[in-house]
Amino acid sequence: MIYQSPTIQVELLEDNIARLCFNASGSVNKLDRETINSLDAALDAIQQDSHIQALVLTSAKGAFIVGADITEFLGLFAQEDSVLLPWIAEANVVFNKLEDLPFPTISAINGFALGGGFETVLATDFRIADTTAKIGLPETKLGLIPGFGGTVRLPRLIGTDNALEWITSGKDQRPEAALKVGAIDAVVAPENLQASAIKMLKDALAEKLDWQSRRARKQAALTLPKLEAMMSFATAKGMVFKIAGKHYPAPMAAISVIEQAARCGRADALKVEHQAFVKLAKTDVAQALIGIFLNDQLVKGKAKKAGKLAKNIDTAAVLGAGIMGGGIAYQSASKGTPIIMKDIAQPALELGLGEASKLLAAQIKRGRSTPQKMAKVLNNITATLDYTPVKDVDVVVEAVVEHPKVKSMVLAEVEQNVSDDAIITSNTSTISINLLAKSLKKPERFCGMHFFNPVHKMPLVEVIRGENSSEETIASVVAYASKMGKTPIVVNDCPGFFVNRVLFPYFAGFSGLLADGADFAAIDKVMEKQFGWPMGPAYLLDVVGIDTGHHAQAVMAEGFPDRMGKNGKDAIDIMFEAERFGQKNSKGFYAYSVDRRGKPKKDVDPTSYELLGAEFGELKAFESEDIIARTMIPMIIETVRCLEEGIIATPAEADMGLVFGLGFPPFRGGVFRYIDTMGVANFVALADKYAHLGGLYQVTDAMRELAANNGSYYQS
């Protein structure tokens, strides 16, 4: 053994070829400070051993290196530039040392080599991957850019345009795509990975492969004609800004770094990268996006833990076909759980099967599936008009019409037709789980399972715990949602559960603005362009359905009359009474039509202004700050109430629910990250300015106390 540490072992193989193996004590290899320090020491030991003539980098884990340890680096990001800049420069000395070894080097990549893991392999002369590999630089998804030489080495390896696309998109790359552009040199079967890597090193030693010129190219300036460079970077900036927008600075920063460093050698190019990395690491956007990443890990960790308590879910059933039932059936079947789709009407079953077929056909069109896979998924969906095929399923998802009496009747009926240990769930957005449980003989085997529409696109599932739901029931439904490829969060029963409970105060703030004369289109523009929502409140109501919103609003008003009760008509009532239900009947706040490409198109509709004007009078202009405050303060305070009341367990789960369930702007990180970034005391002061508008704008005593103690919701 040439070198050994808790994370890295180096040994001599045949023909004086050394193997450096990443082998951390945990389940995966991460590029943390300990690993970087070990790599530095290992390279020193390698340099001091005169027998070594070549080096192969391998991993003893199922993945090469999954990336940097972001939890550890968050502490570093909080340091002053005078600390962070020298640290990243020193870390890069290690990768330079790897790149400068006096003999050929290769990385044998299995599984993930992402972020710092991919930057590590970029420092070797050759890269060979097995068929399981995924490589890439996802840092821009975290509000950062690569900091270990990725913006320097990758453009010099695969060309500027390819590197710009890889880095700004942050997407993982399959080995075939990486081979095509030259990011790796070969793709082999997993069992042949190390042997193939050693053969390449032997070819390099025999001068069949020119490792020295490859290395020199990575360390030199980019060989790109000036005019071509100008066009390349200008095109990239235009395309990337169109996608990323002003709220996500990292992709644009990556382009600027590569452009500035294009005429530089390695040393100066790395300095450009380091300066930009440190600047981005300090931004609120990076903190928010890293926070989402960590919150996602927490939620997935909880789901994994729940899996240990869960019963096996091998077969499922959905009651109620149509669009929602078809979407649920598609999601379950496509992720490997066969599902029975039951309805009382043959046309509904045909609609449900048609929805699943349509979604599968779209996957084939995008190149993400094949006719063979489509057939397999459709074979996993069994349509039926009676309960006979349902009797042996492990879990049932009731997805009939959103009406308490109908749901209660169906739930009682299905309980008589399934095994005693089957779990029954209700896909409801507003109806109390405790109320529905009264129709069942075994309420402990029952909970809510709220999917969001469209099911195949929306990642969130709310798992709603009733007062009698057993832990096994909750754990099993969480595990089933995870198996379906969804992100489950567990919430306790209350009107609206979590997501709808916090959404409708936002709509109430919107309605209040309209009652005071605001222009709904102007509100949408501010909330989309400035705050960052994918849709403003008027557009969102049209998409959800004004009739659906009207019903849910009544449920919320009944559940929380002090805060959500109304005096007189609001904008939702006006649209509902005028039978303007939104996209579903082509008229809501906006008018809807289909453009030449067959896509929905929205236009401002004078009729909406006439209806609202008759009730609320002439339009008035509002400052953007007022619009944001009056819509967001109610949502934020209601989210805080949900945490304080135990409806949602943690700020992390609340923020993930908002981002995945409502499209809360990721660059803001969720409600609790938003409050912490603003400062709790600053938010309380802002809310107090609007407290006269009613209970939705009045902060809780606990929040006021947190502000007084200079506290925060996330503990740093």
Curated annotation (Swiss-Prot):
Its EC number is 4.2.1.17, 5.1.2.3, 5.3.3.8, 1.1.1.35. Residues 1-189 are annotated as: Enoyl-CoA hydratase/isomerase. GO terms for cellular component: fatty acid beta-oxidation multienzyme complex. NAD(+) binds at M324, D343, V400, V401, E402, K407, S429, N453. SUPFAM superfamilies: 6-phosphogluconate dehydrogenase C-terminal domain-like, ClpP/crotonase, NAD(P)-binding Rossmann-fold domains. Keywords: Fatty acid metabolism, Isomerase, Lipid degradation, Lipid metabolism, Lyase, Multifunctional enzyme, NAD, Oxidoreductase. GO terms for biological process: fatty acid beta-oxidation. Substrate binds at D296, N500. Pathway: Lipid metabolism; fatty acid beta-oxidation. GO terms for molecular function: 3-hydroxybutyryl-CoA epimerase activity; delta(3)-delta(2)-enoyl-CoA isomerase activity; enoyl-CoA hydratase activity; long-chain-3-hydroxyacyl-CoA dehydrogenase activity; NAD+ binding. It catalyses: a (3S)-3-hydroxyacyl-CoA + NAD(+) = a 3-oxoacyl-CoA + NADH + H(+); a (3S)-3-hydroxyacyl-CoA = a (2E)-enoyl-CoA + H2O; a 4-saturated-(3S)-3-hydroxyacyl-CoA = a (3E)-enoyl-CoA + H2O; (3S)-3-hydroxybutanoyl-CoA = (3R)-3-hydroxybutanoyl-CoA. Pfam families: 3HCDH, 3HCDH_N, ECH_1. Heterotetramer of two alpha chains (FadB) and two beta chains (FadA). NCBIfam families: FadB (TIGR02437), PRK11730.1 (NF008727). Involved in the aerobic and anaerobic degradation of long-chain fatty acids via beta-oxidation cycle. Catalyzes the formation of 3-oxoacyl-CoA from enoyl-CoA via L-3-hydroxyacyl-CoA. It can also use D-3-hydroxyacyl-CoA and cis-3-enoyl-CoA as substrate. In the N-terminal section; belongs to the enoyl-CoA hydratase/isomerase family. This is Fatty acid oxidation complex subunit alpha. It comes from Shewanella sediminis (strain HAW-EB3). The gene is fadB.
